[in-house]
């Protein structure tokens, strides 16, 4: 249930959209299996396999982005194209030109696609309409971009914005690494990456290693900055923070696992309980993280405009 990665985006808080409205927006873009000659197909699928494209609970929504892609390695296409080009050269008596080679490659691709295997990949999207968060469970930026593209296509005038905090995450992580501690109930763990901004970008990585203050000071004084930092929030959730505010390796700790509802009788009740627990904890953690980074600048702008 728990998201492993958090690609963060802001929505108006609160965002006055109901699950029924969301369902109507997504329905025209519901996932349909691709044809035999399509390389890729994307769309919205049911998060609970019950036909509904939106799962909702207590002003929290869960969506499921599905991508189906044909596995057709470029090496295979190139190999068949090369063999086909040799045949054509023998027939016509002269070397295949660039344009003809390109056309051959397209022809080979069209011939191989129907026989290629397909893989499906699902990516979850959490929408917190109460606190104004839209979070994509994706480690790769390219995947998050695909999800955002379909969101924008599905929802006309989607009021989506980036997270703009007052303090640079890189500067903050570097300071926390130097002091060995972070504010607001956060602690510094034992994974970090420091990188030089100079030519060559010298990089030092610590994995499961004590971050000694003297070592950190030496690296920072040499011009390195912290680009990744493992942290824990209130002994409840551990994660890795990055310069873009993408949060990776999200892991609920024992105190949260013990808070799971023991009275849940079936899969649906357990899902409801786990989703409520996850969204509640993550919403509080995100609010605390934004706070220790100086607050959300977009909120400040809106408050100033309202005044």
Swiss-Prot record:
Signal peptide span: none
GO MF term set: double-stranded DNA binding
Keywords: Cytoplasm, DNA recombination
GO CC annotation, single: bacterial nucleoid
Protein's UniProt keywords contain Cytoplasm: yes
Primary subcellular site in the record, as a coarse category: cytoplasm
GO biological process: DNA recombination; regulation of DNA recombination
InterPro entries: RdgC (IPR007476)
A Pfam family matched in the record: RdgC
Keyword Cytoplasm among UniProt keywords: yes
Residue stretches in coiled coil: none
Protein's cellular compartments: Cytoplasm, Nucleoid
Function description: May be involved in recombination.
Family, per entry: Belongs to the RdgC family.
Listed HAMAP family: RdgC
Name of the protein this chain belongs to: Recombination-associated protein RdgC
Source species: Burkholderia orbicola (strain MC0-3)
């Amino acid at each position: 249930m728990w998201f492993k990665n958090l690609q963060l985006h802001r929505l108006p808080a609160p965002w006055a959209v109901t699950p029924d409205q969301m369902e109507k927006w997504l329905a025209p873009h519901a996932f349909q299996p691709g044809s035999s000659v399509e390389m890729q197909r994307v769309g919205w699928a049911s998060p609970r396999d019950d036909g509904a494209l939106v799962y909702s609970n207590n002003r929290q929504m869960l969506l499921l982005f599905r991508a189906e892609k044909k596995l057709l390695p470029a090496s295979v296409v190139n190999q068949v194209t090369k063999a086909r080009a040799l045949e054509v050269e023998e027939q016509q008596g002269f070397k295949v030109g660039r344009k003809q080679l390109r056309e051959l490659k397209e022809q080979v691709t069209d011939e191989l696609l129907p026989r290629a295997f397909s893989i499906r990949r699902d990516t979850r999207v959490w929408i917190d309409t109460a606190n104004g968060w839209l979070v994509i469970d994706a480690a790769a930026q390219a995947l998050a971009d695909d999800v955002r593209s379909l969101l924008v296509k599905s929802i006309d005038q989607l009021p989506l914005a980036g997270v703009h905090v007052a303090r640079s995450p890189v500067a903050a992580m570097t300071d926390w690494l130097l002091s060995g501690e972070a504010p607001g109930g956060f602690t510094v763990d034992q994974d970090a990456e420091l990188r030089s901004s100079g030519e060559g970008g010298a990089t030092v990585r610590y994995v499961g290693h004590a971050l000694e203050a003297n070592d950190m000071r030496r690296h920072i004084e040499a011009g390195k900055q912290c680009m990744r930092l493992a942290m824990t929030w209130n002994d409840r959730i551990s994660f890795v923070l990055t310069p873009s505010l993408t949060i990776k390796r999200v892991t609920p700790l024992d105190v949260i696992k013990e808070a799971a509802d023991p009275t849940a009788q079936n899969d649906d009740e357990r899902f409801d309980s786990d989703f409520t627990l996850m969204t509640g904890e993550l919403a509080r953690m995100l609010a605390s993280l934004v706070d220790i980074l100086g607050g959300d600048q977009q909120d400040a702008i809106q408050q100033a405009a309202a005044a």
